[in-house]
Amino acid sequence: MKVVLIQDVPKLGKKGEVINASDGYARNFLIPRGLAREATPEVLKQLEKEKEEEKKRLEALKRESENLLSELHKHVFKIKAKAGDGGKLFGSLTSANISDVISKTLSKEFDKKWIVLDNPIKALGTYDVTVKLPGGVSGKIKVEVLREE
């Protein structure tokens, strides 16, 4: 029996896939538990429509992320922090600190999960920080750490 998976099912398939399952398995397990629906022409048509909508949504998300990345490239984000002699910071700067500065500079919400730091920043200077935005868009931004007077 052909069924369309409504949810990811381990060792069987991912959401939206059309699979062949034995009649008993489909009728007694998958369909009653809400894991799958029978693959009728109407269901297949609806599945195609949902895939198209998801594709359009992902394209819009990618376009929005590319615009945000180009806006990020226009700025050098300056962060003031207390530092001792030799330029070492008292403490460190994390992705949360950087996202706060970006949010204030751009007047937009910027999630700290989008910033990829291998290690926290612990010294004064200019750094290239990797950002991974939704939609698979990534790039580097400039962050300058200055001494707080």
Curated annotation (Swiss-Prot):
GO biological-process terms attached to the record: translation
UniProt entry tagged with the keyword Transmembrane: no
Stored InterPro entries: Ribosomal_bL9, Ribosomal_bL9/RNase_H1_N, Ribosomal_bL9_bac/chp, Ribosomal_bL9_C, Ribosomal_bL9_C_sf, Ribosomal_bL9_N, Ribosomal_bL9_N_sf
Keywords, in A-Z order: Ribonucleoprotein, Ribosomal protein, RNA-binding, rRNA-binding
UniProt xrefs under SUPFAM superfamilies: L9 N-domain-like, Ribosomal protein L9 C-domain
GO cellular component: ribonucleoprotein complex; ribosome
GO molecular function ontology, one term from the record: rRNA binding
Function statement: Binds to the 23S rRNA.
Family stated for the protein in its record: Belongs to the bacterial ribosomal protein bL9 family.
HAMAP family: Ribosomal_bL9
Record-linked NCBIfam families: L9 (TIGR00158)
Name the UniProt record assigns to this protein: Large ribosomal subunit protein bL9
Species assigned in the record: Fervidobacterium nodosum (strain ATCC 35602 / DSM 5306 / Rt17-B1)
Organism taxonomic ancestry: Bacteria, Thermotogati, Thermotogota, Thermotogae, Thermotogales
